[in-house]
Swiss-Prot record:
Pathway per the UniProt entry: Isoprenoid biosynthesis; isopentenyl diphosphate biosynthesis via DXP pathway; isopentenyl diphosphate from 1-deoxy-D-xylulose 5-phosphate: step 5/6
Gene Ontology MF, one: iron ion binding
Gene3D superfamilies from the UniProt entry: Dihydropteroate synthase-like, Sulfite Reductase Hemoprotein, domain 1
Function: Converts 2C-methyl-D-erythritol 2,4-cyclodiphosphate (ME-2,4cPP) into 1-hydroxy-2-methyl-2-(E)-butenyl 4-diphosphate.
Protein name: 4-hydroxy-3-methylbut-2-en-1-yl diphosphate synthase (ferredoxin)
Cofactor annotation comment: Binds 1 [4Fe-4S] cluster.
Catalytic activity: (2E)-4-hydroxy-3-methylbut-2-enyl diphosphate + 2 oxidized [2Fe-2S]-[ferredoxin] + H2O = 2-C-methyl-D-erythritol 2,4-cyclic diphosphate + 2 reduced [2Fe-2S]-[ferredoxin] + H(+)
EC numbers, comma separated: 1.17.7.1
Taxonomy, superkingdom: Bacteria
Gene transcribed to yield this protein: ispG
Amino acid sequence: MQTLESTLNPPATASEFDTTIHRRKTRPVQVGSVTIGGGHPVVVQSMINEDTLDIDGSVAGIRRLHEIGCEIVRVTVPSLVHATALAKIREKLLATYQPVPLVADVHHNGMKIALEVAKHVDKVRINPGLYVFEKPKADRSEYSQAEFDEIGEKIAETLKPLVVSLRDQDKAMRIGVNHGSLAERMLFTYGDTPEGMVQSALEFIRICESLDFRNLVVSLKASRVPVMVAAYRLMVKRMDELGMDYPLHLGVTEAGDGEYGRIKSTAGIATLLADGIGDTIRVSLTEAPEKEIPVCYSILQALGLRKTMVEYVACPSCGRTLFNLEDVLQQVRAATQHLTGLDIAVMGCIVNGPGEMADADYGYVGKQAGYISLYRGREEIKRVPESEGVSELINLIKADGRWVEP
């Protein structure tokens, strides 16, 4: 006889305990020397805030980002003059630094701009809501199907030269939909909704596919996290139904600054990455672009998608703590933060110590007042005076051959 409890709570399956993130399978899209999708690591990118006409300033901004781990750099291109300036930027990068994958950001009525800049960059980002921009009419309340299709044909005609150019150069395009700039006909037809964002992207994808061009990356950004998450999930659903496998660029647009801007970006980006959705990310902050890169890598590290720093496991401290946990964690971090790939646990007492740090490579645990127990994995190696804890931890790492000089 089946009980009520077993009906409401069926036995858990092995898959429910799977802690691995299973990434959505996508096609690889090459952007310069970097590959987006196709099972490659999630790519980190950002955008310089210098005026593109400032050649030296733009080159310096690109270098600053690239040197701290930004793998693709986007540059705004609001006019033809800016498009030709990118040729000089690329030339100077090659002469004074090294090749950096560059993306041109093209918006309002960008047909001629995009065609010119496609010669000088690795990828062109276009906004479907603005690429063929028509000023909204105050008295319009709807679009007939004929009117909708007529504009679609105009978009296809306008987009074709760029698609052919990128296809023939074997370069890439990002179809970058923004919730705040959906085309009027999409708004009237689908509303101010994730569906409207998805349909806007699909329209441009179909145009590209009709011209045998599939080096595409897609984004559906919004400043509200629930809208952004819903749009990407719906896009994946539609692409799966249509047999499309384009990689996705994740981001919360206009996230703001400071702690909240970082939390807001993480809430959207990490939610999707945890579901296996997303191939490249950008954290958009109202701060210097260089501030975005550590946030990107921290998100990827926290999810186990890329390991680029030491993973520190530390308890929040309580009345059982036998040393100043906050100070000691800072000391341990200062001494070991260059040992990329290690997991180091700092635990204030024996209650949380060995159990919570079981997966760590090394542990620093308060088990007795004035003394520190050092662990290798689950094994306690030695007990030392608290004043010698950090130096003895370093000695243990050195003895195992895992120490490198900073």
